Amino acid sequence: GRSEDKRSVVMATRSTGINFLSLRESAGIQYYDFYNSFTKITSFKQLEKMKGMFGVKKNYNVGYAIDRSASSSDYFSDDSRVKYFNIGFSGYGDATRVETEKKYLDSKYLTSVYFHSFYPAKEKIIRVKVPDWLELDLREYNFADYKITKQKTTEKNMTVYTFKMLNVPGLKSESRGIGIAYTYPHIVFVVKSFSNDGKKENGFADVGDLYNWYKFLYQKTVN
């Protein structure tokens, strides 16, 4: 794709599907996602199995998404916004599913993905589809102390990397603890280069590419 200033960029789509199961008689959670002028949430659904025609249970969109500014300042505002569901569970074993899709208008802003979240998970699967025209570096951090399986397969005109982790505990919050990037396993995405109409475009292959990007951002600023 192309950015607002007509530069060639790699666009990315992040699709998420989560099944939530209540382990208490009465519980409530809030599922949220942030976006801004560089990203766009194209789908945001809360699904539950309900009886439809002929008694067949199907997933129906039952959630009401709230969309608001993520900035609370009375003096400064930015383009950060948040979309979220308030999800309630009426009893033990209640289940609901959330499915979302977010588009990154420039893949530079899709930096990393983590296996852990605030809620424990029986299974976490991260699947990355890399088209043939894209040179993407998947950098694995803090994998050594965790049992994470990795599989590489091919589909039509793309390579698929599948990471899987079982029995994932929830994130721990500790006072004055170091950032999760130093302790929890995650994958960092680095676009090294890509082909556009037969022409090779640079991403972040080395420090020089990063410097050129910073220089471009600096030149765009108005003092």
Stretches with model-predicted labels:
Residues 1-221:
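Beta-strand-rich, non-transmembrane domain signature
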